[in-house]
């Protein structure tokens, strides 16, 4: 009895940690359940619904939101357990509309990029790693063709895939039935809006093709040209034409495109550069380096019979010249410049030591009425050799007495759809010959410049010239003015309509504003301005008003940054004046009158 009482009085020690853990594993406990119930928050379950409600309430304040949350929490106490859960079937219509709007914004951003297409956006499966991968595109010649900018060296995987696809579709065109009609109509509308804008992205490889393929042309301001005031010229300086990529040598030659806002420059750095002239940025469109060929003369040429046939002719002090084909067919199907070399004169090599001085003109066959281009080369011993602009074959030659110093081209309309091409050449003694190239170089007349000694330049103006060519046969006009420059700086100006019937015509004016050798003579397209310049000294350039023959007094000024002028060019519309100098810069001015 005593032993039993003693056993009952012995206290049982509480379970240690190991026993509690073992009992928990075997029998379980309510600790975890109680803790989870204490931490239970119904807001977590209804988080998506609350977010939708908050998105729909645009004008609610923070205090209002807090009151609504408390009200919702109070209502949850009276909700049955089976109503605390719901089947997610994609959300309500309002949230879907908002998501669709958000996706539309993203799609618009993606569509602004040239590398993203609708096919990539609607792809069934997209690998997110494609955007992280960087693919070098300068390793091989094949990948270099995928560049859209000269500044690119690496692109991500998405751009790489899209460019490979576009390159494939150039070879194997995409069938029309693949695209939806609505998509094709939208694309056509976008193309119509962009047509004529001529906005060039800096470094765009296809910029030249885009500009030449647009229908934008210079405005025809010559037909409605008003008379210039004789004393003051409204002129404003623009950004230098080659500010983005200046030349490494003097600008020896300038040429505006006959119909597009393009300017061609060339010099002894052996590089042709084409700039898109907008007066603000003047981006470089493309450039071409000719190894071992310093450039003395370069010019654009557009065929009268086929507007798509366009070339750039260039030459230096070498026994050959180059022709760069700019036809859209060649530029579209190949990223390599197509350049031909003219060097053979077929028995007349002794009369042509250098191809550096040349001009390009139009010649009409009197029998077939077909029109083709010709290249006129200033040779030695008084010769001028004439080549076919397409084949380079020697067609004819014209010879004068003495040493030829310069020549120019004039046109004479005969009847509707017919014209004559006249070659005017001068020697150092001021003796002038005029040849009819339609009659195999027949001499029309010969006359002498009054007081002409040491003649250096001759130029016609007021009609169709080599620097301002016509794009249609009906637009060809005979030139009214003829200017002759000399080593002493004198420039004699003749009116071809009145004073060219005698063998000793009298000039309408003798301009003596310059005192050094005349190196440039250029007329504005409408013949109201004569620009004369000398490269011997700085700032030796003057603009002469015609027909008053007075020099504009307000320009250039002592602060005009001309430098030593090496080349001058007017735009076909007459609204721009480009001046190249020995520093390799092309100054640009806008003539507000035009």
Curated annotation (Swiss-Prot):
Predominant location: nucleus
Region (Interaction with UTP21): 101-190
Residues that bear Phosphoserine: 182, 184
Disordered: annotated span: 48-128, 176-200
A GO biological-process term: endonucleolytic cleavage in 5'-ETS of tricistronic rRNA transcript (SSU-rRNA, 5.8S rRNA, LSU-rRNA)
Key words, A-Z: Nucleus, Phosphoprotein, Repeat, Ribonucleoprotein, Ribosome biogenesis, rRNA processing, WD repeat
Start and stop residues of the WD repeats: 246-285, 290-334, 463-504, 513-554, 560-593
Other remarks in the entry: Present with 9570 molecules/cell in log phase SD medium.
Assembly description: Interacts with snoRNA U3. Interacts with MPP10, UTP21 and UTP25. Component of the ribosomal small subunit (SSU) processome composed of at least 40 protein subunits and snoRNA U3.
Sequence similarity: Belongs to the WD repeat UTP18 family.
Protein name as it appears in the record: U3 small nucleolar RNA-associated protein 18
Organism: Saccharomyces cerevisiae (strain ATCC 204508 / S288c) (Baker's yeast)
